[in-house]
A protein has these predicted regions:
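Membrane-interfacial, low-structure loops and terminal tails that flank and connect transmembrane helices
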Residues: 11-26, 173-180
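Membrane-interface helix-boundary motifs at transmembrane edges
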Residues: 24-26, 65-70, 105-114, 174-176
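Interfacial aromatic-anchored transmembrane helix boundaries in multi-pass membrane proteins
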Residues: 41-52, 76-107
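Membrane-embedded alpha-helical hairpins and interfacial helices in multi-pass inner-membrane proteins
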Residues: 108-180
Length: 180
C-alpha cells in the first residue's frame, strides 16, 4: 500500500523553470556586427577623403567571425550599397577587389602588417588603374606621387581603426572567457 504513493518532491511547474536566454556571445556578435555595419555605412559619408574604417574592418573581420561570407561580403556590400547613393565609377571592380584581397591576406599575416600591406597594394593597384583608365594627364609615376597624400590618410586611418578594433576584439574575447 505504501509503495503506491507518488513522490511529488521532484515535480516542478513551468514557473519553476528558468527562461531560455539567448546565448550572450551571440548577442555580442550581433551587436558587434551591427556596430561594424553602421560604422562602415556612416564612414562613407565623412568629408575627410580616404580617412575611413572600411579597410580596417575588412582586415579585422576574420578576427571577429569565422563566417567567410560575412568576412568577404560585408565590406564589399557596404561599398556597393553606398555607391548606389554616392554614384558608381569606372574603377569599382579594382576597389572592391582590394577589400577582398585585404581580408584574404589578413588571415595569414599580423593585423598591423596587413594594414601596411593592404594600403601598399591599394596604392599600387588603384592608382595603377587610374593611370591605365587614362584619368588625368599624368604619367604613371606622377599618378603614384599625386596619390601619396590620400593614401597616407588611408594608412593612418587604417592603423587607427585596426588598433581600435583590435582592442574591441580582445575585450569581447576576454569578456566571453570571463563569463563562461
Amino acid at each position: 500500500v505504501g509503495l503506491e504513493q507518488k513522490d511529488t518532491s521532484m515535480q516542478c511547474s513551468a514557473k519553476d523553470v528558468a527562461p531560455v536566454r539567448k546565448n550572450p556571445s551571440n548577442t555580442k556578435f550581433d551587436f558587434t556586427l551591427a556596430f561594424l555595419f553602421l560604422t562602415l555605412v556612416s564612414s562613407r559619408f565623412l568629408e575627410i577623403p580616404n580617412f575611413t574604417p572600411l579597410l580596417a574592418i575588412a582586415i579585422m573581420l576574420p578576427y571577429f567571425t569565422n563566417n567567410k561570407t560575412v568576412q568577404y561580403l560585408l565590406p564589399v556590400s557596404v561599398l556597393f550599397l553606398t555607391d548606389i547613393i554616392i554614384g558608381f565609377y569606372s574603377l569599382m571592380f579594382v576597389v572592391y577587389a582590394n577589400f577582398i584581397v585585404s581580408t584574404l591576406i589578413s588571415t595569414n599575416l599580423s593585423k598591423y602588417f596587413t594594414a601596411f600591406t593592404s594600403v601598399l597594394i591599394w596604392h599600387l593597384t588603384v592608382n595603377g588603374a587610374v593611370y591605365l583608365a587614362n584619368i588625368g594627364n599624368a604619367s604613371l609615376i606622377q599618378t603614384y606621387i599625386q596619390a601619396i597624400p590620400f593614401d597616407f590618410k588611408l594608412l593612418v586611418s587604417t592603423l587607427i581603426y585596426v588598433a581600435i578594433l583590435d582592442v574591441l576584439q580582445k575585450s569581447i574575447s576576454y569578456t566571453y572567457q570571463y563569463n563562461k
